[in-house]
Amino acid sequence: MSKRAQDQDEDMREAKSAFNVGDRTTVDDEGMGEFEDPWEDEVESDQEVIIENDADDDEDMDMDQVNNEIEMDQDNENEDKDIRVYLPGQALDKDEVLEADQSAYEMLHSMNVRWPCLSFDILWDQLGDERCTFPATAYVVTGTQADLAHNNEVLVMKMSQLAKTKNDDGNLSDDDSDDDDVEEDPILEHRSMRHNGGVNRVRAMPQRDQQIAATWADTGKVHLWDLAPHIRALDQPGTMVPESSKKPIYTVESHGRCEGFAMDWSETVPGRLLTGDLNGKIYMTTLNCANGAVSPDRVPFVGHQSSVEDLQWSPSEKGVFASCSADQTVRIWDIRSKKRAGLQVKVHNSDVNVISWNKKLPYMLASGSDEGVFSVWDLRQLSQNAANPTPIATFKWHQAPITSIEWHPTDESVLAVAGADDQITLWDFSVEHDAEETLNGTSQKAIVNEAGVEVPPQLMFVHQGQQDVKELHWHRQIPGCVISTAGSGFNIFKTISI
């Protein structure tokens, strides 16, 4: 499966989500790193009614006439919009377009970038955990897929003044706190580092006290970066980033010229990095966080018959990790054995593109495939080379390859999934059918409108509007907040469902 962005348009289209069908709008987006403002024409579109009382005797008549005209205008507007709920799979008429239902979000912002970014990671900050107030702030690191190799960059971005989303009537919800009374435009600040070649994947160390990131380049090299000076420059106006800090602190060359996409840092052992390439080889590199020394292991883990697509360290066992491959398998490895995986299971009938290890339930692993199917596996029930392994849950909701999958950082039953069908879906596996909804042992799914779209009860939310969605992540310090990247730019949102 090719993970590269196919369309790299300089003019990015507006990203919208949780869609209704309404009138077509045209938006021109220019420049790099700009937040979109869906309300910028609000003042011009408002209509003001001016009442002139030339005679006291005519006052009641004039008021009745004005009220009648207002009601007629409102009725006409409602008839013209013809808004209805949209679900993937439904056909749109020629004059219809998808529009976001703002009331479905607590927060929704979209951001355009000059070049598409295939991958990113969210950085720890010092603003506290469990943040639920607005405006919000988030830090991310990402890398570009530019037109020419020397135009690529690693970007450290700070998104601030992320206000609570207005409802479709332009008002904030009734329970908004006082800090929403004065709404300001969102702010994007960034610092950049030149990167040789396109950036296939970016991963930041998960430890709070480390600001180290790794980038997988399409040149076959893996670069390590110290992001601390760039974050300080974003937080302290006037601070300059030394030229020496704009270069990698180390470059891993274990893969030769073979590029890859799979990469993961260990949460249990700081500094341990895994990288997997298109030749099916996996290498481990160790960074000593105390003195900065880097030790690449030149002997790879071998066994996959095709490209390694994703890697995940075990959240509980220091020397165990999982890999998935285009050979349709998931393998569980012990770092003491490089020639043979401890467990090898064929989990899909096509390329296994992504995996995610549940951090709250370490025996749960989710996988997403090239055929649009994603599954949840209980590792305790899997056996070596099982012919027909049975997942505890599997869904074929997405109509194109699964491109990203990630468990919620604190809720073990919630999963986010992204697909090449331009959908991001949020699932809650704690939701089950009531007994009354089950007939003759067969689960009865909801049928939605004339399109006959079956909606699983575990599906909590469908976010759309981005084109060519590549990757998503939950924000660990803002509960329910998701950030995603696509060919059309970034979205940062928080729904009312999760």
Summary of predicted features, one role per range:
Residues 124-127, 133-136, 206-209, 267-269, ...:
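Residue-level detector of Asp-centered blade-edge/turn motifs that repeat once per structural unit
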Residues 110-123, 192-199, 255-258, 398-402, ...:
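Repeat-based blade/solenoid architectures
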Residues 2-5, 9-192, 220-252, 286-296, ...:
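Beta-propeller domains
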Residues 140, 213, 273, 321, ...:
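Hydrophobic beta-strand positions that form the internal "hydrophobic ladder"
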Residues 160-164, 180-184, 219-249, 266-364, ...:
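Per-blade loop-tip surfaces of WD-repeat and WD-like beta-propellers in eukaryotic adaptors/scaffolds
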Residues 116, 136, 150, 198, ...:
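Beta-rich catalytic cores
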Residues 471-498:
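Blade-level signature of beta-propeller repeat domains, shared across WD40, Kelch, NHL, RCC1
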